Amino acid sequence: QANMTSLNGIRFGFNCSMLRAWWVMLGLPVLLALVFWFALYLIAQVTTSIGGLFFNLVALSLLSAIGLGVVHGITYSKWMPLLGNNATFGIHKFSIQVNVKECIKGCMLAILTMVPFIIVIGIMIAPVFQQLMMMTMLGRSDAGSEFVLQYYPQIMASYFLYFVAILVFASYLYVTLRSLFLNNLTLANGTIRFHSSVTAIGMLLRMLAVLMGSSITCGLAYPWLKMWMV
């Protein structure tokens, strides 16, 4: 892609070891994910014998958020130098130095943006599960259609909030990582610096516009709308 792109007649370039690219793009994320899930499994075995169900859910949810933030933060902190330090523009080389802690912090904050939505969804959907369990205990499993109609507004509202939560999470994470990448990227030994001014709200509005535009055009406008988010 870089070799086929040019600006004012000057071509971009990219040169990187295939083995290193495979390790950074695939090997390291898989290894970190395996270590994370194994550690979470061991912690779950310990907490099961210590506290009750509510304590285990809270503890494991908190540890999962922290672990996912660490895994994604480390992964993205390796991806950025792979792309930035191996790219060129004509005879000039790009250079980037990324702080791993900032990447981890950004990923954790992105995950935390979903917490308010999860709490609201839990409050809305809890009566649904309670009623479902009660019906199962009373042997009224055949009344499923009536049950769905009764709680249809809560179920649809929960799906809608879940969809909004994903968009908020994606927009915040994209803007955070984009800012970390561009604000630390330099060209020609630091002579030229880059800056990102996109906000999370602005990116969220762009994502909504892309989804609406793609839906209206049955996906035909997606390639052009996607370029608007770069």
Describe the role of every protein-language-model region.
Residues 56-65, 98, 106-110, 150-167, ...:
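Pore-lining and gate-forming transmembrane alpha-helices of multi-pass membrane transport proteins
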Residues 31, 35, 39, 43, ...:
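Alpha-helical membrane-inserting segments
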Residues 2-3, 69, 73-81, 85, ...:
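Short helix-terminus and kink motifs of transmembrane alpha helices
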Residues 14-34, 96-117, 196-216:
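Loop-to-transmembrane boundary segments
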Residues 1, 66-73, 115, 208-228:
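Hydrophobic, aromatic-rich membrane-embedded alpha-helical segments
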Residues 33-68, 118-170, 226, 230:
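Membrane-helix interface segments in multi-pass membrane proteins
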Residues 2-21, 81-103, 179-201:
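Juxtamembrane inter-helical linkers in multi-pass membrane proteins
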Residues 1-40, 44, 65-77:
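Transmembrane-helix bundle segments that line or gate the permeation/cavity pathway
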